[in-house]
Design a protein with these regions (language model features):
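FMN-binding flavodoxin-like domain, especially the glycine-rich phosphate-binding loop
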Residues: 2-4, 11, 18, 22-34, ...
């Protein structure tokens, strides 16, 4: 059985945590929140996930700073996920670039990436009730579960 962990930073409305829980349920992963600063599990796991919301076109700074401090590894399987105000495949590639680059430079092999919309009340949006209310929704959760199942086949 594959041993999996997910490093998670979920802020505001816990959108990314909902997605992390869905993926974790399919790959039997332990979720480690970044504020715990726990990296020991990395040594013994086969698959590592990294998830955080997107802010200004990249993962939250807390996730990027955490990734920078990780030890180097050799060809360890990893995946990236996020929630954001706007979703498209092209945007996901761009938004994940900073974290992907850090992880690849540390020796991780990225085997999958996932993104979906999340409820957003940042900046002026709070005055209008936000955007993407109800997201991630049931379809997003199902897609995250399917993503998790695909990770096990990689």
């Amino acid at each position: 059985m594959i041993k999996s962990i997910i490093y998670l930073y979920s802020y505001h409305h816990k959108n990314t945590q909902k997605i992390g829980n869905a993926i974790a349920g399919k790959i039997n992963a332990k979720i480690i929140e970044l504020h715990n600063n726990e990296t020991n599990a990395l040594e013994t796991c086969d698959l590592t996930g990294f998830g955080a919301g997107i802010d200004s076109g990249k993962h939250y700074p807390q996730m990027l700073q955490f990734a920078e401090k990780l030890p180097n590894v050799t060809n360890k399987k990893a995946f990236i996920f996020s929630t954001s105000a706007i979703h498209s495949d092209k945007k996901t590639v761009k938004d994940h670039k900073a974290l992907r680059s850090i992880l690849e430079n540390k020796g991780f092999r990225i085997i999958g990436e996932f993104n979906c919309k999340g409820f957003n009340t940042n900046s002026f949006l709070r005055y209008f009730g936000g955007m993407n209310k109800g997201c991630p929704n049931d379809e997003d959760i199902k897609n995250a579960e399917k993503f998790g199942e695909k990770l096990l086949k990689e």
